[in-house]
Regions:
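Glycine-rich flexible loops
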Residues: 1-183
Length: 183
């Protein structure tokens, strides 16, 4: 996970369990990809965090997870259609799945940026998911929703092909979602 900070971002280090993290373990990475190499290395996924912050001013916090259901759905390398209106929380009428690339590579970052066009979350093929928000709480809540959506989708397709909401209905939902937290 990471948080936008000054001219870069703070990110969890590579190879340190979250339960053992200390403040001094957190790594600052500038938006040009520089970090203090005498300290902890940033997460191997720092590139896509950097590129998300650089390409989207609405991203102030990012959560990346290998959550069970999102990872299972991502293994099919398909977008999740609008089988449920909550798909709109990710920012569109489907939940995109970024094409597969090896973890930690620029290719993976490019694929994620492509999948996140007009979105706040996406699946990462054969990998997991990424979500962003105004703060860590929002990013984490969205990541939880993505996990829930994927769990529900797995259950829905076990029964058969789910009914997909129309584009016009999703347009209505997307407008409602924009104003949902505003009152």
């Amino acid at each position: 996970m990471s948080l936008r900070y000054k001219n870069g971002f703070l990110i969890t280090p590579s190879g340190v369990k979250y339960s053992l993290l200390k403040v001094d373990d957190i790594v600052f990475v500038s938006l040009d990809g520089k970090f203090d190499e005498t300290k902890n290395k940033p997460s191997s996924e720092w590139r896509f965090h950097k590129d998300i912050y650089s390409s989207n001013n609405e991203a102030n916090a990012i959560v990346h997870a290998h959550s069970t259901h999102a990872t299972a759905v991502s293994a099919h390398n398909k977008d999740v259609p609008a089988f449920h209106y909550m798909v709109a929380l990710a920012g569109g009428n489907d939940l995109k799945c970024a094409k597969y690339a090896t973890f930690g590579t620029q290719e993976l970052s490019d694929n994620i940026i492509n999948a996140l066009k007009n979105r706040k979350a996406c699946l990462m093929s054969n990998h997991g998911q990424v979500a962003f928000g105004d703060n860590l709480e929002q990013a984490f809540e969205l990541a939880q929703e993505v996990e829930n959506i994927c769990h529900q989708y797995i259950n829905a397709i076990k029964i058969g092909e789910p009914k997909i909401l129309s584009s016009s209905e999703m347009d209505v939902i997307l407008e409602k979602v924009k104003n949902y937290k505003k009152g």
